[in-house]
């Protein structure tokens, strides 16, 4: 009940915010993994114009969003950073199985604060004494955090780095640690790594399990057809072009 009230208040505040021009029509509430922040910032307004609908976007870690949906949060569509969370909710009959679709594969990047000097080029460089803090998303509920842990373990440096680690609540929060100077480096989503304060290199994908990202419509959505239409837009020509520009691999490429 508290979750439902909280998200209702969030939606009301967004709707009443001054100076925000929003199209008339039905409202679609999309719960989306935080790595989609930049891509969906570009994609959502285009869908709103095409569909004549409004989209309320709620970003967070996939695990936390999944828990909120399980407890009845008023989401219409769930975009996860790891397909396992979608499949779990389908098995629980929380999401509609027939609406499930892969939409991207995420990529992990090593981000270095520009103020540190030359960017780090591999994970072993995190052992440099200049690196006092390394940011990763919380592996308990964030897929990028789990993959970061896998990569650091595969590189043989997890135990040596544990005392340096700081944990973001989601992958955007993790990047903010590096942007703000709270951490000298971090393992972040490539899709959000292009910010002025950091430099980045891709992490070898063989060091972690793939970040295959999936979506589905929530069973109690009052507008499932609009949810399916949004998924189709993301996976359509215009949506795919936007996702590609933001560093995602697309279905058919993995």
Kindly label every feature range from the protein language model.
Residues 7-17:
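Bacterial N-terminal signal peptides
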Residues 20-73, 80-83, 87-96, 101-254:
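Exported/periplasmic ABC-transporter solute-binding proteins
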């Amino acid at each position: 009940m508290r979750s439902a009230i909280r998200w209702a208040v969030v939606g009301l505040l967004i709707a009443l915010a001054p100076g925000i021009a929003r199209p008339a029509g039905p409202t679609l509430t999309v719960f989306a993994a935080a790595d989609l922040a930049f891509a969906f910032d570009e994609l959502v307004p285009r869908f709103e114009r095409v569909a004549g609908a409004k989209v309320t976007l709620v970003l967070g870690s996939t695990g936390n969003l999944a828990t909120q949906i399980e407890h009845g949060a008023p989401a219409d569509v769930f975009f996860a950073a790891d397909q396992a969370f979608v499949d779990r909710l389908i098995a629980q009959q929380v999401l509609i199985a027939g609406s499930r679709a892969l939409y991207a594969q995420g990529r992990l990047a090593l981000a270095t604060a520009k103020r540190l000097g030359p960017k780090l080029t591999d994970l072993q460089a995190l052992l440099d004494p200049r690196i006092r803090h390394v940011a990763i998303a919380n592996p308990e509920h964030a897929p990028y955090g789990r993959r970061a842990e896998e990569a650091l373990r595969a590189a043989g440096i997890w135990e040596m780095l544990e005392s340096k680690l700081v944990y973001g609540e989601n992958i955007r929060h993790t990047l903010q640690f590096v942007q703000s100077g709270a951490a000298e480096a971090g393992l972040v989503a490539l899709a959000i790594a292009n910010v002025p304060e950091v430099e980045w290199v891709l992490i070898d994908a063989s060091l972690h399990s793939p970040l295959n990202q999936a979506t589905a419509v929530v069973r109690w959505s009052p507008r499932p057809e609009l949810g399916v239409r949004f998924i189709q837009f993301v996976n359509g020509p215009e949506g795919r072009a936007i996702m590609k520009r933001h560093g995602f691999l697309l279905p058919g490429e993995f």
